[in-house]
Amino acid sequence: MAKKETKGTQTKTAGAVKAGNGNYYFRIAELEKVAAGTGYSTSHGGVVEGDRMLVGWIHKPRGTGSRMHSHANEQFNYVVQGTLRCEIDGVKSLAPAGTLIYVPANAPHTMVATPDEDVIFMAIKDLSQGIIGKAVDGTMSGPHYDPGFK
């Protein structure tokens, strides 16, 4: 369904597929997996970028996830499978399948798959930057692992 990337169709997220110019339908779960949090998260999955928005079909292995980070783009995550343990701007919650999560632009946040099963979620962001943010502590020293999951 998705065409190969061609000249003039650069994306902000390395490895993402560019939508438009006849490229309108995507089997997002089958796209090449790209890192969706290099240096601070275990998240990875297929990503499609339009002109102003991106959508990712993102996977987090159980017991792993992101360290506290932020990014200039606001974000919605819809949890499809599993449960995320979240903290957004100081507010903690569990987000099971069926939950829509909102992350304001520049809000510090972390999301970790609970130990019982892997998480799949759909990420939707504006394209003020790509899918990857920056860790709040200023380091890109790796993702979060719950004890026993590294």
Question: Where does each model-flagged region fall?
Answer:
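A short, N-terminal "cap"/entry segment at the start of jelly-roll beta-barrel domains
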Residues: 1-52, 136-150
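Conserved short histidine dyad/triad with adjacent acidic residue
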Residues: 39-41, 56-70
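Conserved GNAT-family N-acetyltransferase fold
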Residues: 58, 77, 101
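Short beta-strand segments in beta-sandwich/barrel cores
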Residues: 65-66, 82-87
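Glycine- and acidic-residue-biased ligand/ion/polar-headgroup-sensing regions
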Residues: 73-74, 78-84
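Short acidic-glycine-tyrosine-enriched beta hairpin
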Residues: 90-105
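Ligand-binding loop in jelly-roll beta-barrel domains
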Residues: 105-131
